[in-house]
């Protein structure tokens, strides 16, 4: 399977079309990010391994399948990534949640890491690294750097976003060609201000009602 995938499920595409609209309220935007995050998790988890286990139903003993192997961790890139967490937890309620916080240096325009709070056993977990936007790729690259420094293996990291720019995809693939990238849409380009076009605006501001 390709390391880059656009998830074209009809429900995801329909909800994304509503999410993009400038008239969407903070409440609507928040709910849609939550819902699309959950649907993306369904697609991204499609290849998780299964194992046979024996259980007892009210009628008899039987063999069923359950997810095997590594436990899961959801790691949002703050702040906008927080909006995707609850939707994923609805599908995977036992997942641990870590946080990686970034801000943009106004002089260099580069991301600066200010917070890393991860499960102690993060190196042994399958990781969904989430952020609604993949614009320049700078924050995603730095977040993957942080995970790898803590001994997370590339094959255990999946970056999940809602909208990506070609520039961000290219930058992340060049820096970390060994991780998988999933997006609901690959947009046209970045504009001169670093916004994805046509995009959906500033995801953090629209999620939290700030400017």
Swiss-Prot record:
Q: Which Pfam families match?
A: UPRTase (PF14681)
Task: Please provide the Gene Ontology terms (biological process) for this protein.
Answer: UMP salvage; uracil salvage
Q: What is its EC number?
A: 2.4.2.9
Q: Which reaction does it catalyse?
A: UMP + diphosphate = 5-phospho-alpha-D-ribose 1-diphosphate + uracil
Pathway listed for it is: Pyrimidine metabolism; UMP biosynthesis via salvage pathway; UMP from uracil: step 1/1
Give the record's cofactor note, including how many are bound.
Answer: Binds 1 Mg(2+) ion per subunit. The magnesium is bound as Mg-PRPP.
What EC class is this?
A: transferase
Q: Where does 5-phospho-alpha-D-ribose 1-diphosphate bind?
A: 79, 104, 131-139, 202
The organism's place on the tree of life at top rank: Bacteria
Family named by the database record = Belongs to the UPRTase family.
Per its database record, what is this protein's job? Answer: Catalyzes the conversion of uracil and 5-phospho-alpha-D-ribose 1-diphosphate (PRPP) to UMP and diphosphate.
Instruction: Supply the name of the protein.
Output: Uracil phosphoribosyltransferase
Protein's organism: Lactococcus lactis subsp. cremoris (strain SK11)
Encoding gene per record: upp
């Amino acid at each position: 399977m390709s390391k880059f995938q656009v998830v074209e499920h009809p429900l995801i595409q329909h909800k994304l079309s509503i999410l993009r609209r400038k008239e969407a309220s903070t409440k609507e935007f928040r709910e849609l990010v939550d819902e699309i995050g959950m649907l993306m998790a369904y697609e991204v988890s499609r290849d998780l391994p299964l194992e046979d286990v024996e259980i007892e139903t009210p009628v008899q003993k039987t063999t069923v399948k359950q997810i095997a192997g590594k436990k899961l961790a959801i790691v949002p890139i703050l702040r906008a990534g927080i909006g995707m967490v609850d939707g994923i937890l609805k599908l995977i309620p036992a997942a641990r949640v870590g946080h990686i916080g970034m801000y943009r240096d106004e002089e260099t325009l580069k991301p600066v890491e200010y917070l890393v709070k991860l499960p102690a056993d993060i190196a042994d977990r399958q990781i969904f690294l989430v952020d609604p936007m993949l614009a320049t790729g700078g924050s995603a690259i730095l977040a993957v750097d942080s995970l790898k420094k803590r001994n997370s293996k590339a094959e255990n990291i999946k970056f999940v976003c809602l909208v990506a720019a070609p520039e961000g995809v290219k930058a992340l693939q060049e820096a970390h060609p060994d991780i998988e990238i999933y997006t609901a849409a690959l947009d046209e380009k970045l504009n001169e201000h670093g916004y994805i076009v046509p995009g959906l605006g500033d995801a953090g501001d629209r999620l939290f009602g700030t400017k």
